[in-house]
């Protein structure tokens, strides 16, 4: 449920809708990169990725802990939200391909050329709003639930979140064709 902006006076900022305001994505895009790479067969959950001091073209990502774990499995890097392994993974996948994934997920505030964001996009170097992020994760969860129950995908699985239930959703036709990004990878 979307609850907010209750009727108050301007002193309480009823006119600020933070749900739709673009904010730094922080680490919330990491699962999308992980899923995209699994989907493309470019990563395995137990594959070791480097968590070591790194400098790529003058960019030196750091982990929140300011420490390094050496070689770490991809699933553990995701679970611990380690920054350096995900910069390495994004470098391998490329910002261009990742940008295309984010566009498929309909993160509309991420709308500049991939070169604008560079590798920092995976660590919060882009902005998105809570509404679009919730929509992306909700659609992926729906895809997983439907496939687990029916063993098929739907051609129009990705839907826009709605404020009201005025009309039924059209999920399109059933298909066995793989989607652009399978949520089951998560």
Language-model regions: role of each:
Residues 16, 22-49, 77, 136-141:
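Active-site SXXK
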Residues 21-26, 69-70, 74, 78, ...:
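Secondary-structure capping and boundary motifs in well-ordered enzyme cores
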Residues 60-63, 94-135:
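Mid-domain, small-residue-enriched loop/turn segments at the edges of structured enzyme/sensor domains
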């Amino acid at each position: 449920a979307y609850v907010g902006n209750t009727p108050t006076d301007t002193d309480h900022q009823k006119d600020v809708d933070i749900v739709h305001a673009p904010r730094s994505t922080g680490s919330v895009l990491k699962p999308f990169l992980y899923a995209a790479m699994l989907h493309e067969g470019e990563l395995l959950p137990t594959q070791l990725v480097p968590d070591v001091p790194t400098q790529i073209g003058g960019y030196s990502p750091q982990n929140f802990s300011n420490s390094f774990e050496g070689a770490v499995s991809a699933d553990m890097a995701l679970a611990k939200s380690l920054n350096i392994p995900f910069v390495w993974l994004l470098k391998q996948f490329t910002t261009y391909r990742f940008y295309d994934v984010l566009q498929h997920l309909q993160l509309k505030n991420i709308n500049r050329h991939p070169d604008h964001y560079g590798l920092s996009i995976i660590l919060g170097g882009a902005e998105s709003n809570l509404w679009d992020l919730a929509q992306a994760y909700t659609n992926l969860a729906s895809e997983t639930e439907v496939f687990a129950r029916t063993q098929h995908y739907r051609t129009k699985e990705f839907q826009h979140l709605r404020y009201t239930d005025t009309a039924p959703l059209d999920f399109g036709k059933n298909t066995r064709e793989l989607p652009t990004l399978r949520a089951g990878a998560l």
